[in-house]
């Protein structure tokens, strides 16, 4: 098939990242999609002919705007799915799935190691306020997942690579379990963006990304997306976007559209650098432990190798230096290139010391995490040798 930007399915990932969703401006002739800052769009001469309940069409930016539509087309194509809907944040995207497809009396199986906002939703808010029950399960133990199923189980939710422990879930196996039971499966794939991994190819119903992270990749815009079939996405648009209003701003949609152009190139650098840095950390006897799926010592290394088809193992890792929480803090304060800040997937490397205090599900973390605490490390685009030198110097300063 001849590659043609009018036929997105004909394009490789790198080409798609450049051309997907891009619409040249008919008025100015600009070859890139312009930023459209408008609350409202022109109605037809006879508004009575409109389907006001349709999620399609440009009417009011809370429903959808031009930049939002362009970004959705690109993200759906990158994931290899029919449709996408973007939101103001990744948490809003996650909530949209739960709000649209769960009701009082339903039961959900959730990974016992999960993002804190999801943990609180299913441990506190949804059960207490809406009567939605949740069971937190080690999704790496497929028999435990099967045993947790109930007649009213409506959804299984997991992350591909768990935040922050880097535990890897077998997405294909979990999808089979969910669908055999007549349940849906939603997957947070923020740590594993396309083209590195396409969770949709495992048959999941909903792929969720925090666009704030790798897909934007520059630490300057927030957003989230749910990707799936047209029917499922239309329901989310109708139920959880138009009348709840967590709509992405045109500016952030435009920024993420721009940032995503370099996604495949950035991933190549990030995956390569992360592997080198993980091996370095693993070799230093001042390091208490390193959890990175690319290391042979990682509990799910073989699963990661098979599931990610040799493309890499992500750019997130967790480790700790030998010592107590104060030792972790001193090490972080001695870094000169790596930035101490929350978030991940940015152009710059980010590290955060995460303690046990107040974290839901911490008792399910590996023993080393509970003993030492842990440092969540998001590898950035800097030269890996510079990052290794920074870590070495910080270790020397910490243990002198």
From Swiss-Prot:
Temperature dependence: Optimum temperature is between 34.8 and 37 degrees Celsius.
Gene Ontology MF: a single term: carbon-sulfur lyase activity
pH dependence: Optimum pH is between 6.9 and 8.0.
InterPro entries: Cys/Met-Metab_PyrdxlP-dep_enz (IPR000277), Cys_met_metab_PP (IPR054542), PyrdxlP-dep_Trfase (IPR015424), PyrdxlP-dep_Trfase_major (IPR015421), PyrdxlP-dep_Trfase_small (IPR015422)
Expression induction or repression: Up-regulated upon growth on canavanine.
N6-(pyridoxal phosphate)lysine: residues carrying this PTM: 213
GO-annotated cellular components: cytoplasm
SUPFAM superfamilies in the cross-refs: PLP-dependent transferases
Record keywords, A-Z: Lyase, Pyridoxal phosphate
Consequence of gene loss (knockout): The deletion mutant is unable to grow on canavanine as sole carbon source while its growth on glucose is not affected.
Catalytic activity: L-canavanine + H2O = N-hydroxyguanidine + L-homoserine
Enzyme Commission no: 4.4.1.43
GO biological process: transsulfuration
Cofactor field: pyridoxal 5'-phosphate
Family to which the UniProt record says this protein belongs: Belongs to the trans-sulfuration enzymes family.
Function noted in UniProt: Lyase involved in the degradation of canavanine, the delta-oxa-analog of arginine, allowing growth on canavanine as sole nitrogen and carbon source. Catalyzes the elimination of hydroxyguanidine from canavanine with a subsequent water addition to yield homoserine. Is highly specific for canavanine and cannot use methionine, cystathionine or arginine.
Listed name of the protein: Canavanine gamma-lyase
Protein species of origin: Pseudomonas canavaninivorans
């Amino acid at each position: 098939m001849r590659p043609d930007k009018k036929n997105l399915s004909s394009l490789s990932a790198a080409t798609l990242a450049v051309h997907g969703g891009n619409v040249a401006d008919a008025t100015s002739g600009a070859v890139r999609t312009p930023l459209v800052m408008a609350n409202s769009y022109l109605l037809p001469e006879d508004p009575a002919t409109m389907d006001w309940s349709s999620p399609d069409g440009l009417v009011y930016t809370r429903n959808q705007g031009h930049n939002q539509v362009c970004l959705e087309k690109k993200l759906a194509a990158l994931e290899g799915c029919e449709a996408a809907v973007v939101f103001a944040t990744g948490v809003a995207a996650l909530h949209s799935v739960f709000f649209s497809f769960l009701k009082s009396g339903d039961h959900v199986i959730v990974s016992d190691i999960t993002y804190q906002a999801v943990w609180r939703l299913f441990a506190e808010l949804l059960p207490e306020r809406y009567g939605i029950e949740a069971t937190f399960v080690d999704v790496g133990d497929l028999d435990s997942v099967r045993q947790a199923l109930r007649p009213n189980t409506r959804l299984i939710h997991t992350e591909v690579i768990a935040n922050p422990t880097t535990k890897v879930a077998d997405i294909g196996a979990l999808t089979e379990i969910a669908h055999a039971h007549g349940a849906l499966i939603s997957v947070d794939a923020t740590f594993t963006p396309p083209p590195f991994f396409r969770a949709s190819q495992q048959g999941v119903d909903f792929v969720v990304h925090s666009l704030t992270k790798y897909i934007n990749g520059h630490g300057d815009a927030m957003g989230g997306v749910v990707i799936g079939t047209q029917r499922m996405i239309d329901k989310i648009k109708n139920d959880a976007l138009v009348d709840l209003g967590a709509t992405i701003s045109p500016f952030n949609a435009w920024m993420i559209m721009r940032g995503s152009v370099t996604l495949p190139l950035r991933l190549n650098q990030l995956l390569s650098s992360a592997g080198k840095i993980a091996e370095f950390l693993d070799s230093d006897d001042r390091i208490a432990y390193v959890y990175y799926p690319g290391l042979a010592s990682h509990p799910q290394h073989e699963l990661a190798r098979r599931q990610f088809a040799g493309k890499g193992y992500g750019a997130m890792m967790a480790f700790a230096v030998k010592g107590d929480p104060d030792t972790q803090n001193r090490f972080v304060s001695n870094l000169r290139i790596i930035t101490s800040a929350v978030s991940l997937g940015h152009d710059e490397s980010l590290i955060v010391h995460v303690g046990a205090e107040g974290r839901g599900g911490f008792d399910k973390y590996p023993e080393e995490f509970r003993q030492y605490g842990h440092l969540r490390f998001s590898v950035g685009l800097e030269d890996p040798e510079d990052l290794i030198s920074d870590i070495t110097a910080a270790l020397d300063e910490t243990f002198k």
